[in-house]
Amino acid sequence: MASDGRIVLADSEPTPGDATGIAAVVATLVERILEQGPDNLDVGGIGIGAAGFVDVDRATVRFAPNIDWIDEPLAEAVGKLVDLPVVVENDANAAAWGEYRFGAGEDTDDLLFVTVGTGVGGGIVHRGMLFRGGFGAAAEIGHLRVVPDGRLCGCGQRGCFEQYASGRALVRDARARVESDDPQAQPLLMVAGDGEAITGQMVTGLARQGDPMCVDLLRDVGQWVGEGIATLAAVLDPRVIAIGGGVADAGDLLLDPVRRAFEEHLPAGEHRRIAELRLAALGNEAGIIGAADLARTGG
């Protein structure tokens, strides 16, 4: 990545099933990109966005829910193979930093980034610094409990934010409408062919075409997102809130109900300055750009 946030060269490889092979895959990608680049390509370090709890040292993944990593010294493992400095950061934190530096938050020094995808993630930039907490695991906003004794979450708790305000929740609720033989679900069933084949992209696509049920489903998710970020804003008081992730591809179909619920549920909203809500600007590249910039600048 260039210093202005441009991705100069890109490549990809599937994540191996065996977590012990990930360092080798990263090293292979680095070597391949170096081979593709010009002779004067200057690479100062490697940034890795990892979906999990990353220790304050930005080197060790303490736990990853979808990869068999526990106390994984990822920076050391990759560094031994590529002979370059390595910085590891939580993937949502990296995306937040990317949006702050080069995207939706580049005109502020105070940003709350919320990613609404399969789950809910986030990152906090305060006074131009990425807020990581005392142990490196701050901003796990998807596990803010919003419904006491609510739906069981993969983290082991019940009622977490992401159980109601995520792509997973959107699909679950859409399938429930199909299984209940709701007549409004017929257009979605015709697209999917089967309730189990429903995806968030299908729901969003039909919502864009004006399908009433799919518009309602996105409105429900937006309502939950808005209520959740109102609670977060009461604690963090951000200037800008950027919303990204796959569900955010729905644009105003999601953002309008988010904004309404946010303003309705923000404590004492009529007596305070209210954060500006924006759609994230960098899409799926936010984490790549943020991780690379953290490796370059240290964040």
Tell me the role of every PLM-derived stretch.
Residues 1-45, 55-58, 76-86, 101-110, ...:
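ATP-binding/phosphotransfer module of carbohydrate and carboxylate kinases, centering on a glycine-rich
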Residues 11-13, 65, 134:
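Short hydrophobic alpha-helix segments
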Residues 14-17, 69, 138-140:
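A short acidic/small-residue loop/turn micro-motif
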Residues 47-51, 113-119, 123-125:
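Short beta-strand segments
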Residues 59-70:
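A charged helix-plus-loop insertion that forms the helical arch/lid used to bind
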Residues 89, 97:
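Generic enzyme active-site microenvironment
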Residues 91, 117, 291:
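Active-site glycine-centered loops adjacent to acidic/histidine catalytic or metal-binding residues
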Residues 124-140:
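Short, charged low-complexity linear segments at domain edges
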